[in-house]
From Swiss-Prot:
Pathway assignment: Metabolic intermediate biosynthesis; 2-deoxystreptamine biosynthesis; 2-deoxystreptamine from D-glucose 6-phosphate: step 4/4; Antibiotic biosynthesis; tobramycin biosynthesis
Record GO biological process: antibiotic biosynthetic process; polysaccharide biosynthetic process
Positions where N6-(pyridoxal phosphate)lysine occurs in the chain: 199
Pfam families membership: DegT_DnrJ_EryC1
Cofactor(s) demanded: pyridoxal 5'-phosphate
Lineage, highest ranks first: Bacteria, Bacillati, Actinomycetota, Actinomycetes, Pseudonocardiales
Gene name of this polypeptide: tobS2
GO molecular function, one term: transaminase activity
Source organism of this protein record: Streptoalloteichus tenebrarius (strain ATCC 17920 / DSM 40477 / JCM 4838 / CBS 697.72 / NBRC 16177 / NCIMB 11028 / NRRL B-12390 / A12253. 1 / ISP 5477) (Streptomyces tenebrarius)
Family: Belongs to the DegT/DnrJ/EryC1 family. L-glutamine:2-deoxy-scyllo-inosose/scyllo-inosose aminotransferase subfamily.
Protein name according to UniProt: Putative L-glutamine:3-amino-2,3-dideoxy-scyllo-inosose aminotransferase
Keywords assigned by UniProt, alphabetized: Aminotransferase, Antibiotic biosynthesis, Pyridoxal phosphate, Transferase
InterPro entries linked to this entry: DegT/StrS_aminotransferase, PyrdxlP-dep_Trfase, PyrdxlP-dep_Trfase_major, PyrdxlP-dep_Trfase_small
Reactions that this protein is recorded to catalyse: 3-amino-2,3-dideoxy-scyllo-inosose + L-glutamine = 2-deoxystreptamine + 2-oxoglutaramate
Amino acid sequence: MTSELALFGGTPVRTEPFPDGPRFRERDLERIREVLESGSLGGIPFPNRTHRAFAEQFCGRLGARHGVLVANGTVSLSVALRALGVHAGDEVITTGYTWMGTAASIVHINAVPVLVDIDPNTWCIDPAAVEAAITPRTRAIVPVHLANQIADLDALLEIARKHDLVVLEDCAHAHFAEWRGRCVGTHGDAGSFSFESSKIMTSGEGGFLVSGDETTHHRAMSLVNCGRKEEGYDSFEGRMLGWNNRATELQAAFLIGQVEQHDELHAQRKSNVELLTKGLTEIGGFTPVGDDDPRVTRRQYYEVLYRFDPEQWAGVHRDRVLEALLAEGVEFEGITFYPPLHRDSLFTVSAEDWPMIRDRYGDRMGPEDFHLPVSERAAYDESVWVHHSLLTGPATDVDQILEAVAKVRRNVDALR
């Protein structure tokens, strides 16, 4: 039985890579050529022609009033926080189970990140934990819509109103996902999106900031464009020290066609997710995270989250099962995707470099500063992340995924 598993020398179920990356049609390539031949590749004049076209298209699809394309998603978060009036020393509450860029964007503006635990059902930020963490220094809440889940916006917005806080939605995973029929990113005071290379929409790198308030938008435009305060975005008082965080015309050109193709690809992913979930449920040990919350009116499938149950796999740990699946040609991720943020080696914050944290954390932020048991359990034991590249191809791809899972399940004793 041992030899059947590819991990021990058997033949893998799949040897071909899954399809990945954007699909460029001839019209998309023409648009890119037009930019290359225009002689105007960068962000000046700001916003440049293709940037304007994409911003109008993306905001129109989201139902957002204002938006600006920027260099990347972390930049989008930092710019949004400053544009919303978060200052040095202000506390910003966010989730302990996210990519480090969410919290790093807070540190980068000399504000103080406060990490709280996640809801055990959705693995998004727990509203009760948010409210418990509020202090007189709290200025903002940054919920993350994680994978195919959406944070409880009703509860979070109610808390924000009660305590006079701003809400910045981190929608890096959630392009065009909907809460109560409205796209995420448009419920809070601002929303941030990512177009990094792994995302369902990508320009290699890139980010987008949306807001419903003109002054917030004008401040963001100025911050992105080196602090310039030019006609069209000069309604706010004073000046702000900005950076060059402009996106290029090529980034905008890459993205326009992906908005046009989104619904077709989304339908394919949705169908494949349904097939995968049905098959994994039949095999056992992989339960979809979350529930059928009627307030979630459209999910996105950048990643799909499952909860692993070792009791249905003869007590074998998730990581060992995922190792065997990888050998079969199917990459599901666990701790390699997101460790809990307070234990992430990439998120190293000391008062020597970022003095505003000293009052709350002393010389450095460390694991001892946080109690995040749900985040730790999800990261180290339960979470299984399935990337959209496994879900955008034909249904036969899902058949092979399920074949691999079933094969590993048949041979689970060999993994003990």
